[in-house]
Structures are given as structure tokens and as C-alpha cells.
Amino acid sequence: MENKIHFDRSRQPETVIPERLEVPEACEYRTASGVRIYVLPAPEYGVVRLSFVFRAGSSWQKVPFCASATVNNLAEGSRDMTARQIAERLDYYGSWFDVSMDRDWSVVTFVCLSKFFDKTLEVARRIMLEQEFPQEEQIGRASCRERV
């Protein structure tokens, strides 16, 4: 016996405006070097989202495509990890990595389960602080594009 839910698509659903909307207040911290850190606690979700936001969008670059190339190649290797190792490590912990860029900002985001935050943070540290753009990785990507 199968229960099927039928939606009447010819009628727009009723709009419901919530009586209250609770938005938790972010806490601001500063590191010794003056970097601002904003924390929006929501422990009930068991997920951590860590975003690094840089004033480094396309309007700040002196060489065309420099900002885009830099942010898009961040996961291509670190001092001691290849792009594949980075991807496998993040995948192993179910972590997610994304970059975005606009005219004003470059954003690097990591999302992971709270219980794997320390492991994901270690990979993030390597990507953000020990970054290298290994020539072998760049050549490999270029040859893949040529084959397509």
C-alpha cells in the first residue's frame, strides 16, 4: 500500500508569516594580530562552517585574472599534500570545501561535521598557510583540458 501525497499545483500555497523570528547574535573575537572572528553558535546542528573572507576580489588585482586564479587554485597542493591528497582527506571526513570571488571579496569556505572539525581545520591550515601551486598539478590540469 503506497501513500501518495497530492499537491494541487493550480493553487498557490497559503503564505504564512511567522510570529517570531529568532536570529542568534554573532559573537566577535579578535586575534592578537587583529583578525576579526565571528562565531554564530548553533550546536544543535552538529555542523561547522568556517569561512575565510579576504578583501581580494577582482577590483583589487593588479594583473587580470590573478585573484580568480589564486583562489581557484588553493586546493591544488600545499607544502606536503597534493591536490588529490587534499581532496581525499576532506572526502574521508565528509568535509566540503568551496571558494568564491566577486569584485570585492574572495571567500574560502570549509563545512564539516563538528566531530571532525579539528581534522578539517588541519587541512584548512595547510591550504591557507602552506600553499604551493605545484607545477606538476598545473601541467596535469592543462593536459586534461587539452584532451577535452
Show where each model-derived region lies:
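His/Glu-rich zincin catalytic helix
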Residues: 1-88, 122
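Acidic/histidine-enriched segments that form metal/cofactor-coordinating
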Residues: 2-7, 87-145
